[in-house]
């Protein structure tokens, strides 16, 4: 008999992370571990960490996109906490979600009450 059956088992396939399977950048395995260790429930389904990682990734991308726009509006190439603050507070839905959140070094939105603004006086100078 020739060497049939002596090739051994199949070569182990290259490991593929659950994040790459789901097409995500956020770590599905780490989210799963944190859900298990966090005493949220006795058991954690396989889809829960994937869904949660996807939601976190989406929210992060949304905030970073708006903060990048705020940085570009201020002619800066680096996002600072001020840009995050401006991005969140100028977006209605993000502001509602993060309404009670304080961003360190974020400052406040520029806002001057209308009553405090100088009155526009209509002075008509009649040339005679």
From Swiss-Prot:
Residue numbers bearing the N5-methylglutamine modification: 105
Modified residues (N6-lactoyllysine): 10
Gene encoding the protein: H2ac12
Self-association state and partner proteins as the record states: The nucleosome is a histone octamer containing two molecules each of H2A, H2B, H3 and H4 assembled in one H3-H4 heterotetramer and two H2A-H2B heterodimers. The octamer wraps approximately 147 bp of DNA.
Keywords: Acetylation, Chromosome, Citrullination, DNA-binding, Hydroxylation, Isopeptide bond, Methylation, Nucleosome core, Nucleus, Phosphoprotein, Ubl conjugation
Family matches, as Pfam families: Histone, Histone_H2A_C
Disulfide bridge partners, by residue number: none
Citrulline modifications at: 4
Modified residues (Phosphothreonine): 121
Residues the record lists as Phosphoserine modifications: 2
Gene3D superfamilies assigned: Histone, subunit A (1.10.20.10)
Single GO molecular function: DNA binding
Ubl conjugation in keyword set: yes
Name the record gives this protein: Histone H2A type 1-H
N6-crotonyllysine sites (modified residues): 37, 119-120, 126
């Amino acid at each position: 008999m020739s060497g049939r059956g002596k090739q051994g088992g199949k070569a182990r396939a290259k490991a593929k992370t659950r994040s790459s399977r789901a097409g995500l950048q956020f770590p599905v395995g780490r989210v799963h571990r944190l859900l298990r260790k966090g005493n949220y429930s006795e058991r954690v389904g396989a889809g829960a960490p994937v869904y949660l990682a996807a939601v976190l990734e989406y929210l992060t991308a949304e905030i970073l996109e708006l903060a990048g726009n705020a940085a570009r509006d201020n002619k800066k190439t680096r996002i600072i906490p001020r840009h995050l603050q401006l991005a969140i507070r100028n977006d209605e839905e993000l502001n509602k979600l993060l309404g009670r959140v304080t961003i360190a070094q974020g400052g406040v939105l520029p806002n001057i009450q209308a009553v405090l603004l100088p009155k526009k006086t209509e002075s008509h100078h009649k040339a005679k």
